[in-house]
């Protein structure tokens, strides 16, 4: 891989051990993927997890004197000040959370603690070269916005932020952004949940291929729809780029989506029955519940408003906790507009700066939870909590009853 004289100096340690380690990471990544060079990036997003590996890497760079040339936004870990009022954590878990925040402050990150940066906190333009980690963020910025990012890890995204560059391979190159597989959709998509189930189907069908979707009916996905679609396609598969013909910016036509290549025969037709079968496969669990968890990816203000409408003044069962995880700006807006206070009177709590995959939720493990997000269920089940997946209205009804029928 070609390096400029300046890049060679960084690799040789002339600008400090921390920046050297970041460059070593980028160089190794570039060589692995046959990148011809490094290119400058305009933005970065780091999927910090508040877990040991990510925190160690950031601390290692900081100890070597590194700071970010391109300050990245960050994923959430958990709101230690707020959630410790409700749930017990160990000293080690709290110390790790505090270490994480301190390390990313020192390296110069923008501490947004938000898993959907392309929606509001770090929105790239069409064609911008960026380095975004977080599985739901990458398909959103590539597919819905037409920015250019590979499926970065938190490690490589932070290295790119420190150096201000990323290897030139993969989705940074025009010909690698074209579709690989054609899927037709003839189904009703009425809310975010439907788009999430569609995404889950697409991920299973496409794997790591780049799907091109043709809709038989006219659809207008919202930013939340795009976000949930990509999040689930990256959960059941490894989708980091997609096209929706006539909808997403790089697919004005079917021919453009495939980059002039021969258009393949449709690999599948997704119908209402396809979505229903997928939903049935994901949503079998019933019984008493102890938790409704929403916000994976983080909820927006409009989604919080919809929850208030669905409750219609009714209250959460005393046996059930109801948590909305949202971008901190949405939480602040809800408080300013008195929406948060109204929901709290019904037993609904919301928190910003927090992920579903954190130790603060461990008291719920072993009992049934409910969510509208297959991605949430995937991560929580890895921590020992079975989850049922339902559309939002059903989540609300289950919370009121304290059980899922």
Give short role names for the model-derived ranges.
Residues 1-405:
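Non-transmembrane, aqueous-exposed alpha-helical and coiled segments at domain scale
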């Amino acid at each position: 891989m070609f390096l400029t004289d300046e890049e060679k100096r960084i690799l040789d340690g002339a600008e400090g051990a921390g920046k050297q380690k970041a460059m070593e990471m980028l160089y190794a990544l570039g060589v692995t993927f046959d990148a011809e060079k490094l290119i400058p990036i305009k933005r970065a997003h780091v999927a910090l997890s508040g877990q040991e590996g990510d925190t160690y890497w950031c601390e290692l760079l900081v100890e070597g004197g590194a700071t970010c040339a391109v300050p990245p936004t960050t994923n959430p870990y958990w709101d230690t000040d707020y959630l410790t009022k409700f749930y017990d954590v160990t000293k080690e878990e709290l110390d790790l959370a505090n270490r994480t925040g301190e390390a990313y402050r020192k390296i110069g990150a923008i501490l947004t603690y938000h898993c959907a940066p392309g929606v509001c906190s770090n929105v790239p333009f069409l064609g911008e070269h960026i380095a975004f980690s977080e599985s739901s963020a990458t398909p959103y910025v590539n597919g819905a916005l037409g920015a250019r990012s590979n499926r970065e890890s938190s490690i490589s995204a932070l290295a790119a932020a420190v150096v201000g560059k990323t290897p030139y391979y993969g989705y940074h190159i025009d010909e690698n952004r074209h579709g690989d597989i054609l899927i037709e959709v003839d189904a009703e998509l009425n809310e975010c949940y439907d788009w999430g189930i569609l995404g889950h189907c697409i991920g299973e069908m496409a794997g790591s291929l780049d799907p091109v979707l043709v809709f038989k009916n006219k659809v207008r996905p919202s930013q939340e729809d795009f976000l949930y679609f990509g999040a689930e396609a990256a959960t059941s598969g490894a989708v980091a780029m997609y096209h929706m013909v006539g909808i997403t910016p790089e697919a004005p036509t079917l021919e453009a989506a495939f980059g002039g290549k021969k258009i393949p025969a449709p690999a599948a037709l997704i119908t209402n029955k396809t979505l229903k079968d997928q939903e049935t496969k994901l949503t079998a669990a019933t019984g008493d519940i102890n938790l409704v968890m929403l916000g994976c990816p983080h909820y927006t203000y409009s989604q919080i408003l919809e929850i208030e409408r669905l409750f219609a003044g009714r209250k959460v069962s005393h046996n059930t906790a109801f948590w909305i995880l949202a971008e901190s700006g949405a939480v602040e807006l809800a408080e300013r507009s008195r929406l948060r206070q109204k929901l709290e009177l019904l037993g609904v709590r919301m928190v910003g700066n927090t992920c579903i995959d954190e130790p603060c939720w461990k008291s719920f493990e072993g009992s049934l939870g409910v969510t509208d997000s297959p991605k949430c269920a995937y991560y929580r089940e890895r921590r020992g909590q079975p989850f049922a997946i339902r559309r939002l209205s059903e989540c609300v009804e289950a919370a009121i009853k304290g059980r899922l029928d």
